[in-house]
Amino acid sequence: LGKLSELTDLGVEVHFFTGNHDLWCGDYLTKECGVMIHREPLTTEIFGKEFYLAHGDGLGDPDKKFKMLRAMFRSRTLQTLFSALHPRWSMELGLNWAKHSRLKRIDGKEPAYMGENNEYLVLYTKEYLKSHPNINYFIYGHRHIELDLMLSSTARILILGDWINYFSYAVFDGENLFLENFVEGETKL
């Protein structure tokens, strides 16, 4: 958190897109570190290119149970009720919930890329692109897979992978966008 504060103190904008594990993050990062929190997708122009940036959680996912659960987690009423619980109980509940979620995946890994016609973030993006053809780059996290896919002659989707297993991130140099992987001792920042 100190490094985030150092960056924002230097005038670097730091944006954080909340996802399925961050729904209740509150305003701590904003108040203490100067981080801009985004709970919804953001469309922005950078060096003449149009970007659609989002965590990816809930975008195009057809699972009705997931949608209902997500709506419950985003409910201010339920958040208020949960915050009234003693931390001993709320932490226990949260940790058990996370453990149960991890155990659903026997190997502990995110499902592999399901293909262009089955990957729900790709399907969502293709549909969104029909009504927003000016967007050049769609960048997501959430799926924990690395993907760089051309959707048209002017539009691409990138799914970033993650910072725990792949150490992956996107770089835009003003002209080109590409995925990189941080390698300690080799990657120049």
Language-model features, listed with the residues they occupy:
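Short amphipathic alpha-helical patches
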Residues: 27-31, 92, 96, 105-108, ...
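N-terminal short leaders/motifs
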Residues: 1-6, 104-135
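A broad, low-specificity signal for short, low-complexity segments enriched in glycine/proline
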Residues: 8-18, 97-101, 117-121, 138-142
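Short, solvent-exposed aromatic-acidic interface loops
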Residues: 181-188
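Conserved beta-sheet core of the metallophosphoesterase superfamily
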Residues: 34-40, 52, 57, 61-73, ...
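Core catalytic region of metal-dependent phosphoesterases/phosphodiesterases
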Residues: 1-46, 165
